[in-house]
Amino acid sequence: MKVREVIRILENNGFRLDRQKGSHRRFEGVVEGQIRGVTVAGKESDEINKATLASIRRQSKLPNELFRSG
């Protein structure tokens, strides 16, 4: 899964870009009544490795199904 796909998933689920420094983007959104912060690193065309994607899923508290590619 590419960084741009993860960003699209976050934005489609109410997350908004809070700040950016270099290739690191910090998104904030409300999930289950709580403000969640998610950091996404890399250029939009970069592939995200499995461990990083798992961390993004944990940070966001969004359903795992949203992050399944295919």
Language model: regions and residue ranges:
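A short, structured beta-strand/loop element
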Residues: 19-53
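Ribonuclease/tRNase effector modules and their secretory precursors
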Residues: 4, 29-34, 64-70
